[in-house]
């Protein structure tokens, strides 16, 4: 009987530990959606997660370890959110992108502003840049014949600028455009670049 209970207790303990880690990461993530990294204390994260500062230090080392765990969460959430077939319409692809930006755009802009101060952000942001470029090239890259490699690269660069997180920030936050207006403007820019009528 004692042998049967031991695995149960170990698996229950492991599940509780995993649940605690998840609560801590999600608490830090919620705070990051609204605030700068340097403004958030481990005590705030601990209070939000229902644990102690010392437990966070034991599990994650310091704030950078916790930031790494949040980066893993952000990557995991972005994959399904951004997955659309390559052959969907410009509008459908941009609806997916803009929904993603609505979910995490402000946090990503804050991350970009803090990239030099927090080395833990660099891998995620570099991966994000690479994935955005690939996403743009796959969905909007020219099918026009006769473009040289240089012209194709320039076109992809223009399309990246049109769909970049900073373009969304300019339109949505700085100019106060609605989500629908941002979509309309981005669709028009992409279609014009591709030589299509909006």
Identify the function of each model-found stretch.
Residues 95-109, 119-157, 163, 180-195:
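Amphipathic alpha-helical packing segments from all-alpha helical-bundle domains
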Residues 54:
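Key DNA-contact positions within bacterial/archaeal DNA-binding proteins
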Residues 60, 113-118, 162:
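Short helix-capping/turn signature of helix-turn-helix
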Residues 1-48, 59, 65:
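Basic, helix-initiating cap at the start of DNA-binding domains
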Residues 32, 60, 65-74, 124, ...:
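Alpha-helical DNA-contacting segments of helix-turn-helix folds
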Residues 59-60, 185:
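Residues in the recognition helix of alpha-helical DNA-binding motifs
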């Amino acid at each position: 009987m004692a042998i049967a209970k031991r695995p149960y207790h170990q698996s229950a303990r492991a599940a509780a530990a995993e649940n605690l880690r998840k609560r801590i990461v999600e608490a830090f993530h919620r705070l990051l959606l609204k605030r700068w990294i340097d403004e958030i204390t481990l005590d705030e994260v601990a209070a939000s997660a229902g644990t102690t500062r010392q437990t966070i230090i034991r599990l994650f080392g310091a704030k950078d370890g916790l930031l790494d765990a949040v980066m893993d969460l952000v990557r995991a959430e972005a994959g399904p959110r951004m997955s659309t077939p390559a052959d969907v319409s410009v509008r459908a692809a941009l609806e997916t992108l803009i929904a993603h930006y609505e979910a995490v755009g402000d946090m990503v802009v804050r991350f970009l502003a803090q990239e030099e101060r927090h080395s833990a952000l660099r891998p995620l942001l570099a991966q994000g840049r690479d994935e955005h470029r690939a996403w743009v090239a796959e969905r909007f890259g020219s099918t026009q014949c006769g473009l040289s490699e240089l012209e194709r690269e320039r076109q992809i660069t223009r399309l990246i600028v049109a769909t970049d997180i900073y373009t969304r920030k300019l339109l949505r936050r700085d100019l106060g455009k609605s989500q629908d207006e941002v979509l309309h403007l981005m669709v028009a820019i992409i279609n014009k670049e591709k030589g299509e009528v909006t």
